[in-house]
Regions:
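Structural preference for solvent-exposed beta-strand-turn elements
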Residues: 1-373
Length: 373
């Protein structure tokens, strides 16, 4: 027997879900679509490795090792198979590298694998330079990832910036038309600007979900960025480049601001945006005495208009903004009953932030206006 282990289904499924987050789903080289199991270390521990070259995942988990060895199985097929099984003990064994048997109760399946030696040697984790609470990191990533540029040609804007310094820790994303920024109270002894590629964000969120009470340790070397949670390690290829000077576009003196209920504002935008011109997807925001009005109109779809009561006694204000950009922020701040909308003039960027100002971090969002027709 070349390989034989036994593991609880829940333990195995949790590891497979992490590996699936970076696995190539439809195409790619065999190494990108397979997962390596290695039980040669013994002591009831099995190591696991998956990679798509840009991101790599490595972990160890508890299992009964009946025959130490190494096998590589198709990641998605194994994950989907284990997911559908009832909770029980799962046995994985192989008498030859490309024929791996998986048993659970009365279920028995034969998987075709690949040679395990195609997987590179896993690099050891470096000493961390910074630690982040896993729940806070997950919340921060969800509040910034939607502002990452979807255009592959703008490779630096395809990344999220982790800006570490002795006075602040900031996570920033922008696509050139909007910017999301979260600032944490913790600070790093070392000043670093780390670019995290868009494709690594969801695997990193998955890692935070599996971290439990563990903090996420961040380590950096010349080629890769590593995030470690307990026995789990996510390694990301380092992106080189200069992120834009985001501080230059942060509004400073806005002059006027309005507090508005988050859910009523979101409802009004969602109701009216379906009537917006499909080329711009813009809604018009009009603020006047005690009223915030959201409207959209197009010759193709018609017109919609909704009003929200607010407290405002300043000069009237009218501007247009991309409806989806506004909705992204409002959905990400579902725990905040009110948001603060600050503005200067229709040609300047609007600043939005949660109205309560509480929590372990500050969250700012900046949106450029659209041209009014």
């Amino acid at each position: 027997m070349l390989f034989a282990i036994r593991s609880a289904r829940r333990t195995l499924l949790a590891e497979l879900a992490q590996a699936l987050a970076i696995s190539a789903h439809k195409s790619g080289s065999p190494i990108e679509t397979h997962i390596l199991f290695d039980s040669t270390a013994g002591f009831g521990r099995v190591s696991l490795q998956a990679t798509n070259y840009d991101e790599s995942y490595a972990s160890t988990f508890n299992a009964q090792v009946d025959a130490p060895g190494r096998v590589a199985l198709p990641t998605r097929r194994l994950h989907d198979y284990v997911r559908l099984l009832p909770d029980s003990e799962i046995a994985i064994s192989a008498s030859e590298p490309n024929a791996i048997t998986v048993r659970a109760g009365c279920s028995k399946t034969l998987f075709t694998g690949i040679a395990p030696n195609v997987f590179p040697q896993a690099s050891p984790a470096r000493a961390p330079i910074f630690h982040l609470d896993s729940d806070i990191l997950a919340a921060v990533l969800r509040r910034t990832k939607f502002a990452i540029s979807p255009e592959d040609s703008r490779y630096v804007l395809n990344c999220l910036l982790l800006d570490l310094g002795p006075e602040h820790t900031r996570i920033v994303s922008t696509d050139g038309n909007r910017l999301a920024l979260v600032e944490l109270s913790g600070a790093s002894a070392e000043s670093l600007a780390i670019l995290i590629p868009r494709g690594a964000i969801d695997p990193l969120i998955a890692l935070t979900g599996a971290a439990g009470d563990n903090e996420i340790a961040v380590a950096v070397d010349d080629k890769r960025i590593s995030f470690t949670a307990g026995a789990r390690l996510l390694s990301i290829r380092k992106v080189t480049g200069n992120f834009p000077n985001y501080e230059a576009v942060l509004p400073t003196e806005q002059g006027r601001e309005v507090k508005v209920g988050r859910q009523p504002f979101l409802d009004a935008i969602e109701h009216t945006m379906q009537f917006a011109d499909s080329r711009k997807s813009a809604v018009k925001i009009q603020i006047r005495e005690n009223i915030l009005e959201v409207s959209a109109a197009s010759s193709e779809y018609g017109e919609a208009r909704e009003c929200i009561e607010i407290e405002f006694n300043g000069e009237p204000f009218t501007a247009a903004y991309n409806a989806s950009f506004l909705c992204d922020f409002l959905r990400a701040t579902e725990s905040s009953p009110r948001i603060l909308f600050s503005f200067r003039d229709p040609q300047s960027a609007v600043g939005i932030r949660p109205g309560d100002g509480s929590g372990p971090f500050t969250y700012r969002y900046v949106v450029m206006p659209c041209t009014l027709s």
